[in-house]
Amino acid sequence: MAKHRLQQVADTMQRVLGDVIQKELKDPRVGFATVTGVEVSADLQHAKVRISVMGSPEEREAAMAALQRARGFLRKRVAEEMSYMRFVPELHLIQDTSLDYTMHMDEVFRAIQHERLVNPPKLDDEQ
């Protein structure tokens, strides 16, 4: 299947899943979950759904467990919204930790910047 078509399917699935998670799932454990990306296999049999969840590690784990249990409902809603598709991919929900990594790296850079302000590096002439 053409890459353009796969990307269209992935983008539509991301929008649909994001809306369903935010507006239709009633499980309070889900909290602030955001669909950050969807990758669809070339044969449209599988879709990796990346989800970013805010909260403590325990809250994130509980939210991902709740989303895993809701996979059937999510897939059904995708099928309803994308009724033009003959087959709806199996959803593989993956916790997206890239935001955590970005925040961690930001903290590291801020610490380095602070250290340079407190203890500026010595120039060769000053040694």
Curated annotation (Swiss-Prot):
Entries under Gene3D superfamilies matching the protein: 3.30.300.20
Lineage, opening ranks: Bacteria, Bacillati, Chloroflexota, Chloroflexia, Chloroflexales
Subcellular location: Cytoplasm
Family: Belongs to the RbfA family.
Function comment: One of several proteins that assist in the late maturation steps of the functional core of the 30S ribosomal subunit. Associates with free 30S ribosomal subunits (but not with 30S subunits that are part of 70S ribosomes or polysomes). Required for efficient processing of 16S rRNA. May interact with the 5'-terminal helix region of 16S rRNA.
Protein name (database record): Ribosome-binding factor A
Gene name per UniProt: rbfA
Gene Ontology molecular function: any one: ribosomal small subunit binding
Keyword Cytoplasm listed: yes
